[in-house]
Amino acid sequence: MKQKSILFPCLLLAASVYAWLESGQAELFSGQDQWPVLLMLLGAAFVYQGKKEAVTPHFFIGLLLFGIGLHFFAKPKWVWWPDDFEMLLFMIGFSLLVSTVQKKEYVYEAVSMICFSLFLYFFKQIMAWLESAHIPTALLKEYWPFVFIGISLLLLLIKRKKSIR
């Protein structure tokens, strides 16, 4: 007999809690009626269902939704919070790492994504440090995206051995 999924009740609960928060009947925290809160609630529902029923893709999507919601909720409140591009890449890498680390799949890809997002976050500081050490950075500032495009294309086009995973 096939077991029924708890996904629909979890999603319904998340949407209902958001509707209650948006109605303003209770003031729990500032910004409770904004759309990032809905993303976090839906993400939490997917995380719970994915963990409870061992559905890794739902767990990954849940972490990603929760992280994106958290980013857009926290960004206006804290000045030090990273920009969209860096943080979204970080959230993708973090979600992939957490959801697949038990199976030891995609760990290299997840860590690479996290490192790339950290590189982007600290890019200005790295360039300032190189310039203070009197290392020319004009070419690096202009052409670094093309280096990563080249690396990506090279990784896509080379034949992979089956022993990678």
UniProtKB/Swiss-Prot annotation:
Keyword Cell membrane in annotation: yes
Gene: ysxD
Positions of disulphide bridges: none
Membrane topology: Multi-pass membrane protein
Principal location: membrane
Organism field: Bacillus subtilis (strain 168)
UniProtKB keywords: Cell membrane, Membrane, Transmembrane, Transmembrane helix
Keyword Nuclease: no
Cellular component terms per the entry's GO annotation: plasma membrane
Chain ranges passing through the membrane: 6-26, 28-48, 54-74, 78-98, 110-130, 138-158
Protein name per its UniProtKB record: Uncharacterized membrane protein YsxD
Superkingdom of the source species: Bacteria
Subcellular location(s) of the protein: Cell membrane
